Swiss-Prot record:
Swiss-Prot/TrEMBL GO biological process terms: regulation of DNA-templated transcription; regulation of flower development
Full protein name: Zinc finger protein CONSTANS-LIKE 5
Pfam families per record: CCT, zf-B_box
InterPro entries cross-referenced by the UniProt entry: CCT_domain, CONSTANS-like, CONSTANS-like_Bbox1, Znf_B-box
Amino acid sequence: MGFGLESIKSISGGWGAAARSCDACKSVTAAVFCRVDSAFLCIACDTRIHSFTRHERVWVCEVCEQAPAAVTCKADAAALCVSCDADIHSANPLASRHERVPVETFFDSAETAVAKISASSTFGILGSSTTVDLTAVPVMADDLGLCPWLLPNDFNEPAKIEIGTENMKGSSDFMFSDFDRLIDFEFPNSFNHHQNNAGGDSLVPVQTKTEPLPLTNNDHCFDIDFCRSKLSAFTYPSQSVSHSVSTSSIEYGVVPDGNTNNSVNRSTITSSTTGGDHQASSMDREARVLRYREKRKNRKFEKTIRYASRKAYAESRPRIKGRFAKRTETENDDIFLSHVYASAAHAQYGVVPTF
């Protein structure tokens, strides 16, 4: 949506100068600029002067009202001069993307040009009783953003509407009456729409309930809803907890309340879950106690020597106050001789001991 003319004028403070007055009468604000005469004229003077001479003229800038207009901004619906166009459309990146076209010159009088503009605009044709042919400009399916098969056949028929002040009163939707059929799709289906008035404030698409398919045995069949916020619906079976979004794009309802017939009491679920966990933990404890008792029965308290060679070497090492001490050369000789004497005492005479 474009800026209004008053908001455009308030963007810069340099446009506070008075509007250019008419060069002919010097009393009325100029509205057009004649390029041949290089004169600014009001509508009355322009009609009087250019009734017979068809000079090329343009409108005066609608913002500063000091220079002839150079471009027309479609977003702002305003004719702007070169300086005002540069100032306004360089204010921000959004304004710089406005579509602008060179201003159109006219050769008729200003009153005739104003009458043509008012007749071509939507608001200008409401005051006169004229016949508008809606098929004068062909409406393509691509322009509506729709596929060709979505358009009814009667859209291609010529349609003429008598537009006037008498016909327009009380009928603000005369342009959109035919397009309501494009939005209201009704497909034949087996869905039964039931609106759930639960007192909610926000609006959401109406939830519908599908009819169950004929089955021979429903004992082990569960209808699961993947859109529910409660996880209890996956554990506890119910008759029908599935909900689907309405196929109509304009059908709305209120937010359903959580207190429905298909909901399960949370306290019951919590108590049953807690009781099962307590029973499992007690059984695990009893199993651990039994395993501990079996190990205690098979426990042996007898002393075993794993490395006999290490024990023998430790007994032969010298000790000082019960602790191991380092051996010296003299001690090694004494130990050797003591072993020799001990072995000779127990051996027979003349036999060389062996080690």
